[in-house]
Amino acid sequence: MFVHHTDDQPTHRTLLVADGIARGLNVQGGRLELYGTAPQPVWTRLGDHAAAGAAALTLSATTNWRAGDTIAVGPSDFYGMAATERLELAADAAGTQLSSRNRLTAARWGRLQYATSAGMRLAPEPGFNPGTPTVLDERAPVANLSRRIVIQGSDDAAWRNSGFGAHVMVMGAASRVVIDGVELRRVGQAGVLGRYP
């Protein structure tokens, strides 16, 4: 049995790279348990507006996210025209503050809106009770996509041109597999039955 680390001796980051031939992590009648530590929290929302071109973001919650982590910032526009954007963190999170290596291409809403006697506002009206709901939350979601254990295929011509990536295959009724908190990159093999991530 292969044991990479235990709770007493954790590792910071593990990268499992599949070879260029089979590109598979195969379990035949055995046991595979992968428990990665997920970032905390896994997702939150913006805590303030973010303009197009912004590299600094304010979140609504404190995180333990690290430099190099990949985050996804969801759209917040009413018409659904903006796409989710992937950013790479330039530094460890500082409280609720993030700084990224790349910039947002579209603005994101990041403030709560409150029902008031004059309509929706960014601050509640003291003493005004419109019934429910009183708060509209359209803040953009922000998720951390990085995990400390990564299973990935090679970034070569076979992947780029043919979709030939890594896969995890579990065979036999006696096999036991638990995968939790693991990131998969360049996985799946296009056009091959049973070669899914």
Model-derived features with residue positions:
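Beta-strand/loop edge motif enriched in small/polar residues
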Residues: M1-P197
